[in-house]
Regions:
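Membrane-proximal interfacial segments on either side of biological membranes
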Residues: 1-328
Length: 328
């Protein structure tokens, strides 16, 4: 039942100007209040301005379905609570059609559980069990006909006993969506088998991702991973349908599980690439190729790769016992 219950307010009228204040009501078992609601008649329209807030309440699925037209079956709201404070303005024509809607909201959520199955995450994060818990989430939300903006921060838990932090910002206008994400990864054990890299749990690490989407393509301006003296950075990466359309730079500077220091840069110059560096352990790459049951090669991750790569690496490790110097 979506009816408004227990409606109370103060009301005053002047010429073409309606003012309501101290509005209290209950909707879907949640108590809301509004300090003011102003309705002003101007020519052939009504201009509406007001605010709306609620104190700490439990989230119910009926409210989520009503607002988002989606019951988000992969999110568990059973123990979730939220606090909100919003301001809004809009115009209402004689046919009661809303125009020029603007909303500014501050939302606080607690105890959201996301069910997300991903073999890719499992490949990188040890003991990932398809659940991510979010607590103490603070979200700012702005909406207008031209732009949608959401930014915030939250604690997140892959292991229910250990928290990490996430910060994010998403801005959408027309067909373009910008995104910024910053993740603290201290309490995760991370394994990247293709480059023989491992991060131990409790070691400080961060991941920063900036980019945008446009016409189904994903552009990563920067992907920056840091853990102590280890660094992995990608610049200007463009992806479509899980294929790489372009990448301008890759920088690898890390100690791998075999205690070998990888220090190389892949840099695009016009349509070709140069691969330069002090040292690179190719053991894992060679093993992956030799043990593969597929005829696919590395370059099939690219869409129409048609470039030459000039290589100049001081030291390349081929296997446990063999190292090539001045590889070019």
């Amino acid at each position: 039942n979506d009816n408004i219950k227990a409606l109370n307010f103060n009301f005053s009228i002047q010429e073409n100007d309606y003012k309501l204040d101290k509005i209290l009501f209950k909707f879907n078992k949640i108590n809301f209040n509004s300090e003011f609601l102003n309705i002003k008649q101007e020519n052939n329209k009504y201009s509406v301005k007001g605010n709306l807030s609620n104190k700490k309440n439990k989230i119910n699925n009926d409210l989520i379905l009503l607002i988002f037209k989606n019951n988000f079956q992969n999110i568990n709201f059973a123990n979730s609570t939220f606090i909100s404070n919003s301001e809004f303005t809009f115009d209402l024509n004689k046919k009661f059609k809303i125009k020029n809607l603007k909303i500014s909201s501050q939302l606080n959520f607690d105890d959201l559980i996301l069910k997300y199955e991903s073999y890719k995450i499992k490949n990188f994060i040890k003991n990932y069990n398809n659940l991510i818990s979010f607590k103490k989430s603070e979200i700012n939300f702005k909406y207008s006909d031209e732009k949608f903006l959401i930014d915030g921060s939250s604690e997140y838990y892959i292991d229910k006993n250990y928290k990490d932090l996430i910060q994010f910002k998403i801005e959408k206008s027309k067909n373009k969506t910008k995104f910024e994400t910053f993740l603290n990864l201290k309490n995760l054990e991370i394994i990247v088998r293709d480059i023989a890299y491992k991060k131990i749990k409790d070691d400080e690490a961060t991941l920063q991702i900036n980019g945008f989407t446009n016409n189904k393509k994903i552009f990563f301006n920067q992907i920056n991973y840091k853990e102590s003296d280890n660094k992995i950075e990608l610049n200007d990466l463009e992806i479509n349908n899980n294929k790489i359309l372009n990448i301008d730079k890759i920088n690898l500077d890390f100690l791998n599980v075999y205690n070998f220091k990888n220090q190389i840069d892949l840099i695009k110059n016009n349509n070709n690439y140069s691969l330069n560096g002090k040292s690179f352990d190719s053991t894992q790459l060679i093993n992956n190729i030799s043990n593969s049951e597929s005829d696919n090669n590395f370059f099939e991750i690219f869409e129409n790769f048609n470039s030459t790569i000039k290589v100049n690496i001081d030291e390349v490790k081929l296997d446990k016992n063999n190292i090539v110097n001045n590889f070019n």
